[in-house]
Amino acid sequence: MKKNNRVVVGMSGGVDSSVSAYLLKEQGFDVIGVTMQIWQDKDEEAVRVEGGCCSLSAVNDARRVANKIGIKYYVMNFKDVFKEKVIDYFVDEYLRGRTPNPCIACNKYIKFEELLKRAWMIDAYYVATGHYAVKEYDEERGRYLLKKSVDTSKDQTYVLYNLTQTQLEHILFPLGKYKKDEVRELAKNLGLPVASKPDSQEICFVTDNDYGKFIRENAKEEIKPGEFRDTRGRFLGYHKGIIHYTIGQRKGLGISVGKPLYVVDIDAENNVVVLGYGDEVFGDELISYNNNFISIDKLEREMRVKAKIRYNAKEQDAVIRPLEDGKVFVKFDNPQRAITPGQSVVFYDGDIVVGGGTIERKVR
């Protein structure tokens, strides 16, 4: 595609994507706002008024912003591919005893794959979002780099580590050099109707934050109760289905042995949830798969990095080493709490995202 200045901005109806659209228009881009319709409750008539990024209120907010700043605006249907790539994945991972991150899957398959395809269909060279991240081209490496946002408290590079070089060429992150307070202040000064709208906190398609209920309603198999066992294999009691548990969990176990117990492993094949004491939740080695690298073409030798194993975690000193089949062995300098299969581990070199992958298992 020939390079041009047309950009599709993914508009969720929130302040970040709204200000992103405004900033790009001010920079001279031909801006088209798009809200992705990605999920609907089973009762199609019951359109949610509040909540997720495809709710009626979100569409109305995005349309009002588009009218205010003077850009074209469309709602596009992504329901089928969202169900396949995000919903089904989310449910299947829980059924396998893993804890998925649907936002990472949505970014990988929907926002920066499917939306980019739609953008190209309407002759737009770029896609932009309200993510707090920085994209730069490094002449020396001949690669695009993904770097942390100026506002480190809002940095979202953890959920963007899957981006490819082709995708990065066509992506814009207008908010990377701004702090959240500055974005809200700008929205307020512009009179944008979403200036004071709170940030979304929950997974957009789980309306009441009840993951178990959502999985039961969307699973293709029955959720069966099973056994709690300790790390030596001794029976402790019964659980209500592995979908209700995640590594490091303490609440809601219903088991009392005089000392606090935590989920330390989930054996989906045998429908067993393994419980242990606090020190048994920690580990310093893991293996990741489905790895993607951004600052380097591939991991060819041992490399010292900072790594983190969940979105809100602090980065920790670690060494990464390539394994067969594209997997990566990660050794932390210090034990980490609740290394959770299904979550992502992301590697950093200062402000630069080296890459990352999905946690397959804790080694020890």
From Swiss-Prot:
Q: Name one GO biological process term.
A: tRNA wobble position uridine thiolation
Q: Where in or outside the cell?
A: Cytoplasm
As one GO molecular function, the record gives:
tRNA binding
State any GO CC term.
cytoplasm
Q: Which Gene3D superfamilies match?
A: Adenine nucleotide alpha hydrolases-like domains, HUPs, Translation factors
SUPFAM superfamilies given in the database record: Adenine nucleotide alpha hydrolases-like
Q: Which UniProt keywords apply?
A: ATP-binding, Cytoplasm, Disulfide bond, Nucleotide-binding, RNA-binding, Transferase, tRNA processing, tRNA-binding
Q: Which CDD domains match?
A: MnmA_TRMU-like
Give the chief site where it resides: cytoplasm
Q: Does the keyword ATP-binding apply?
A: yes
Question: What are the annotated disulfide bridges?
Answer: 106-204
List residue numbers at the site (Interaction with tRNA). Answer: 131, 343
Report the catalytic activity: S-sulfanyl-L-cysteinyl-[protein] + uridine(34) in tRNA + AH2 + ATP = 2-thiouridine(34) in tRNA + L-cysteinyl-[protein] + A + AMP + diphosphate + H(+)
Give the top-rank taxon of the lineage listed in the UniProt record for this protein: Bacteria
Look up keyword ATP-binding and say if it applies. yes
Q: Which residues form the active site?
A: 106 (nucleophile), 204 (cysteine persulfide intermediate)
The UniProt annotation places ATP binding at 10-17, 36, 130
What are the boundaries of the region Interaction with tRNA? Answer: 154-156, 310-311
InterPro entries recorded for this chain? MnmA-like, MnmA-like_C, MnmA-like_central, MnmA-like_central_sf, Rossmann-like_a/b/a_fold
Record EC number: 2.8.1.13
Query: What HAMAP family is this protein classified in?
Result: tRNA_thiouridyl_MnmA
Give the function comment from the record: Catalyzes the 2-thiolation of uridine at the wobble position (U34) of tRNA, leading to the formation of s(2)U34.
**Record NCBIfam families:** PRK00143.1 (NF001138), trmU (TIGR00420)
List, alphabetically, the PANTHER family matched: MITOCHONDRIAL TRNA-SPECIFIC 2-THIOURIDYLASE 1, TRNA 5-METHYLAMINOMETHYL-2-THIOURIDYLATE -METHYLTRANSFERASE
Q: Give the record's family classification.
A: Belongs to the MnmA/TRMU family.
Q: Under which name does UniProt file this protein?
A: tRNA-specific 2-thiouridylase MnmA 1
Per the UniProt record, the source organism is Thermoanaerobacter sp. (strain X514)
